[in-house]
Amino acid sequence: MDICVRPVWAEIDLDIIANNMKEIRNLVGEKEIIAVVKANAYGHGALDIASTLLENGASRLAVAIITEADELRDAGITAPIMILGYTPINFAENLINNEIEQTVYDVEYAKELSDFALKLGKKAKIHIAIDTGMGRIGFLPNEEGLNKVLEICSLPGVEVVGLFTHFSTSDEKDKTYTYEQFSKLTNFNKALEDNGIHIPLKHASNSGAIMDLPETYLDGVRCGIISYGYYPSEEVKKENLKLKPALTLKTNVAFVKELDEDMYVSYGRTYKTEKKSKIATLPIGYADGYSRLLSGKAKVIIKGQFANVIGRVCMDQCMVDVTHIEDVKIGDEVILLGEENGLKFDANDMAEIMGTINYEILCMISHRVPRIYKKNNEIVKVRNYI
């Protein structure tokens, strides 16, 4: 690679992002697509993929926190942006002036937003969250919750853009609980309509429901992990969407040395060579998001072959056994997460080792890691965060 970046990088294929989004569009038809780009677009880089998502099917974006929304607005993104989580009221002027749509689940908060908006001569755009069974944020779908939402809808400085809930088990085979959640939301919405309140954008379907439950699409859907090419679980109907991971994590060999039998590698002396061995050091560690839990368990791809990670992953480096691979040298390219010529070690494989989910693996890739964007197999953008 001729560009000047640190020898650890994540390659993101924008053509794959585009194709994944087109697949989602084909599945959901004319429903509005809210592309979730929180956590730096699940590690893919929100600033640099937002336009690709919007050009290929999404009409809205969703983030978790105000600074994520600000970053997109500052970059010139004009599409509607929804904040899925909590924003302190001292950011109210920012929300209103930048037309950022805030999730609301508290009457007093809504009143404060309304007051700020009236002072500015504008409307605060909001989505009202209903807790149908996640046990997280949101009004409960009971009479008390209904009265609170009706009060919010009457506030003069507020424009209620959306009503939504979040499914907790839509990616599981048994959909019983998801149907219960969906029924609670639709019944709550009917009660609102019976009181003369008609909210334009009702949304509930997350990635699991998008794949398996078209009857839950309502007015719009929220796609997260599937935009980036990963399925939310092994229990969804994968045949409904043809997805491909867009991100490959790479590095270059930093050093190669031979060790005699009975020599130790890395902290704690957890690995000892059983024979004369060739060991390659890679300049990536847990500070980059390459977890210490991968120590002695992960694989990498070098010269078309797997090599095992040995010893403990360090903060900035790790070691792999390349005894069986000929002519490994400093500068050779290494795939830590991805696929090449039929060999695959991806976020699902890492997640299984670490006892977590593919979402977390992607989000762990830190800001120390440059992102390199490709279209038509050519580099079109490099993002160095630090």
From Swiss-Prot:
Classification lineage: Bacteria, Bacillati, Bacillota, Clostridia, Eubacteriales
Gene: alr
Keyword annotations: Isomerase, Pyridoxal phosphate
Molecular function terms from GO: alanine racemase activity; pyridoxal phosphate binding
GO biological process: D-alanine biosynthetic process; peptidoglycan biosynthetic process
Stated family: Belongs to the alanine racemase family.
InterPro entries per record: Ala_racemase, Ala_racemase/Decarboxylase_C, Ala_racemase_C, Ala_racemase_N, Ala_racemase_pyridoxalP-BS, PLP-binding_barrel
Enzyme Commission numbers on file: 5.1.1.1
Organism: Clostridium perfringens (strain SM101 / Type A)
Leading EC class: isomerase
GO annotation, cellular component aspect: cytosol
Record-given protein name: Alanine racemase
Disulfide bonds: none
UniProt function note: Catalyzes the interconversion of L-alanine and D-alanine. May also act on other amino acids.
